[in-house]
């Protein structure tokens, strides 16, 4: 049966979420915008990801965290929901770490994406 599902993400930082979506080459739009299911049930989202089948997905901030909102029956992304969330959370964590290290005076020297999917980040801070 078609219905909109909310999936907990533990994502709290909007800018890091948007950077993570960009890093995954996922096109998104700022909300508020509505998404709907087959029966016309609608929900307003803060970040919208359009799908070719017009059953868009999005993120809505509830209390302190963003939740993924989607009609999973009409999921049309290159990965499964689980893989999508895994990759999104990895990129989100990477963005949080990178932003925090830059705020503390470090600069990124290099990053490597390993075959196992892990990311190696090298940062440095000069002391005078």
Swiss-Prot record:
Subcellular location: Plastid, Cyanelle
Listed InterPro entries: Uncharacterised_Ycf35
Keyword S-adenosyl-L-methionine attributed: no
A Pfam match: DUF1257
Major site of localization recorded for this protein: plastid
Keyword Plastid (UniProt): yes
Membership in a protein family: Belongs to the ycf35 family.
Protein name listed in UniProt: Uncharacterized protein ycf35
Originating species: Cyanophora paradoxa
